[in-house]
């Protein structure tokens, strides 16, 4: 069986968004599932709109998602000699010709055709003139006058297109640059691409591409056109639906695996399963399970999926993603056991890493900031004995596991006659500055002996100064 070779060919005219990221993911997963190859190609022939910054952003987005490529990135702007060679092949074989029709004339004929309810295809004025090359000449592909071009699509099935409705289309502009449809075909042929998975907005391009494959005596790739991604109101996905770029999701605290899980469910399914690891996706992905109806992007569902991935994550694996967010807040955080222990206490309490960074603040604040209302309510003289006694008990322990801490809390409860809740809350405020935090036992264990005792002592001093 021939090795599967897929590609992702973004245009660097902006950020990588949900639709493009899903296309990249489907191609990458299929290549990895089949033991094939995945190629990254930057389609930057639109000189006016393409930017280096956008290309770099797309590459960073893919790297963050963990979508790695086996070849590339190739840049179309550096392949002009290849396109020129293939233009000459089509001219020599009679499948293409020079055209000098002015833009004004073409515009006039187009407007007239539309006004008369006709398809505005080229009328063939230059088709049989055998014109020589010139500065103002474009190159057109000679489309058959009759018959149909059939697309056998793995998702949509068979689709037939009347050749007469396609017309002779431009494949090289007068400035010698190739048009999109032509460059794509040449690239896919020369790079050995044999499987093309893309959005179904490309279906109308496909008959033109099939005709060029045949004119160049090249084997057709397998086409799989995936339904578009829509917003919850069933219109084309945009920012007003809450969709952001991939890098914005990174900066907002989403996990790569969380976003990938949500992306793959926009058009692909495996029974009723909602949550997938990356390994599972590679094992399970197939074209047969791509649906025929549009995927609907739901920000709330993405958030829930992300929370599930955070909950199931190894703290050590989350640390590199959380660290930049903590440093952004000005904390001297490092990727060490202290950070891993802090993360462990927050796995069930955080839907995003940004939320986790906010909730982890008390682990790194020095000095600790206190919520005024919490201080006024709990750091009061009648609770000073609780803090002093607990500090004394904790200082003698060999370790701070929950099992080791329980007798210390029990002793304080017995001595003061207060229930656990009445003890835990003043301790929580003393250690975190807040009334909400992870469980008190795990908080103490994560803070460690030195910080726990220092903060209990600081709280006692604060109470003394306030009286």
UniProtKB/Swiss-Prot annotation:
SUPFAM superfamilies: An anticodon-binding domain of class I aminoacyl-tRNA synthetases (SSF48163), Nucleotidylyl transferase (SSF52374). GO terms for biological process: glutamyl-tRNA aminoacylation. It catalyses: tRNA(Glu) + L-glutamate + ATP = L-glutamyl-tRNA(Glu) + AMP + diphosphate. Its cofactor is Zn(2+). It is an enzyme of class 6 (ligase). Binds 1 zinc ion per subunit. Zn(2+) binds at residues 99, 101, 126, 128. Its EC number is 6.1.1.17. GO terms for cellular component: cytosol. Gene3D superfamilies: 1.10.10.350, HUPs (3.40.50.620). A motif ('HIGH' region) lies at residues 10-20. One of its GO terms (molecular function) is ATP binding. InterPro entries: aa-tRNA-synth_I_cd-bd, aa-tRNA-synth_I_codon-bd_sub2, aa-tRNA-synth_I_CS, aa_tRNA-synth_I_cd-bd_sf, Glu-tRNA-ligase_bac/mito, Glu/Gln-tRNA-synth, Glu/Gln-tRNA-synth_Ib_cat-dom, GluQ/Sye. A motif ('KMSKS' region) lies at residues 236-240. Belongs to the class-I aminoacyl-tRNA synthetase family. Glutamate--tRNA ligase type 1 subfamily. NCBIfam families: gltX_bact (TIGR00464). HAMAP family: Glu_tRNA_synth_type1. Catalyzes the attachment of glutamate to tRNA(Glu) in a two-step reaction: glutamate is first activated by ATP to form Glu-AMP and then transferred to the acceptor end of tRNA(Glu). PANTHER family: GLUTAMATE--TRNA LIGASE, GLUTAMATE--TRNA LIGASE, MITOCHONDRIAL-RELATED. This is Glutamate--tRNA ligase. It comes from Desulfosudis oleivorans (strain DSM 6200 / JCM 39069 / Hxd3).
